A protein has these predicted regions:
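Binuclear metal-ion centers of metallo-dependent hydrolases, dominated by the metallo-beta-lactamase
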Residues: 1-6, 116, 130-206, 211-216, ...
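Active-site-adjacent beta-strand anchor residues
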Residues: 51-54, 162-163, 270, 295-296
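Short internal beta-strands
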Residues: 49-59, 123, 180-191, 249, ...
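Short coil/turn segments at beta-strand junctions that form active-site/ligand-binding loops
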Residues: 18, 31, 49, 95, ...
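C-terminal regulatory/interaction regions
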Residues: 211-325
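Short acidic low-complexity segments
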Residues: 11, 19-28, 204-220, 234-238
Length: 325
């Protein structure tokens, strides 16, 4: 029977014997600290306590200058579950509790859809926990973007594909890796090279600094995968001014009317590393959970919708809860 609560240090699941910290901000001296993946907002400050994490986040964290000390990928009575968010991302199943971390239940290139385990208590993210967030199939997105690129290539226009440096950029590198030539922003190249060393089948290429120094960017058209950045960024300004590049930004927020995706890109494409609304609903159904806690996103709205559907759901807040599991 664990008490689940949200604290300033993340989610704590405690009983009289031990505490499990889910994506904590700081590592304590005692307890088990689960790190779901290597996005910066999920990496904890250093500490001496035990860290449970898959091997991939450790290597990615090191590339980003973060060391996960005392880390293991296996502990008795704890099961790591592929979450499909980014490479190496996991959810955690323990004591009939399933914590999703950031999760996606759709295939996207080398990333495979998360499989939802049965549990009594579900702690789920709901980044896109409003009905307006329903994303098109990945096959439809790939077809649309390939048509855009083909049209631009016919006009001699180079293309920048913009997505988060870790996660989205690797997906874009694979989904659109057949275009030639393809280059990578230097930061994306470093991340891609690390992924390739861990077995991810990404096309090898050079970084933008080398490509520019060799005059390769003058030989248009080309495709480049770069981190998400606004039109005001100096890199984008330079690429626009010197090479007349066309930018395509990828985000789950791309089609939102209320929460507009405003980075000043020429095209905005709704591709996400998270579940959309319908996928979140299906996730909850597949878990067969008796109790659902919503975190990260539209927690109140999504919990209300779940209750209307007959589930027992509530947002997880920074107070002790009277509900136990």
């Amino acid at each position: 029977m664990r008490n689940i609560r949200l604290t300033k240090n993340g989610i704590e699941c405690s009983d009289s014997v031990s505490t499990v910290y889910l994506d904590p901000k700081k590592i304590q001296n005692q307890g088990v600290h689960f790190v779901s993946h290597a996005h910066i907002d999920h990496l904890p400050n250093s500490g001496d306590g035990t860290i449970l994490s898959s091997t991939e986040p450790n290597k990615i964290a090191q590339l980003r200058g973060v060391t996960l000390k005392n880390s293991t990928d296996s502990l008795e009575n704890f099961t790591l579950v592929d979450s499909g968010h980014i490479f190496g991302s996991k959810g955690l199943l323990f004591d009939d509790i399933f914590y999703t971390g950031d999760i996606s239940t759709r295939d996207r290139g080398f990333l495979k859809a998360a499989k939802i385990p049965k549990c009594k208590t579900l702690i789920t993210e709901c980044t896109f926990g409003l009905p307006e967030f329903v994303l098109p199939p990945v096959t439809e997105i790939v077809k649309q973007v390939n048509e855009i690129i083909a049209n631009l290539y016919s006009k001699g226009k180079p293309v920048l594909l913009l997505g988060y440096e870790l996660g989205k950029a690797q997906t874009l590198s694979q989904l659109f890796g057949d275009w030639d030539p393809i280059y990578y922003h230097d930061s994306v190249k470093k991340m891609n090279d690390l992924h390739r060393s861990m077995g991810v089948p990404l096309k090898d290429s050079i970084g933008h600094t080398e490509a520019e120094s060799k005059g390769l960017l003058d030989k248009k058209p080309w495709v480049m995968v770069a981190p998400m950045m606004s039109a005001k960024n100096n890199f984008i300004k330079h690429m626009k001014t010197k090479y007349d590049v066309i930018t395509i930004g990828f985000s789950g927020w791309a089609n939102s009317k209320k929460f507009g995706f405003s980075r000043g890109t020429d095209y905005s494409i709704p591709l996400s590393d998270h579940c959309d609304y319908n996928e979140l609903i299906q996730l909850v159904k597949e878990s067969e959970a008796e109790r659902v806690y919503t975190i990260h996103g539209f927690v109140d709205e999504f919990a209300l919708d779940l209750n209307k559907l007959g589930f027992s759901a509530q947002p997880l807040r920074e107070i002790s809860l009277d509900n136990f599991c």
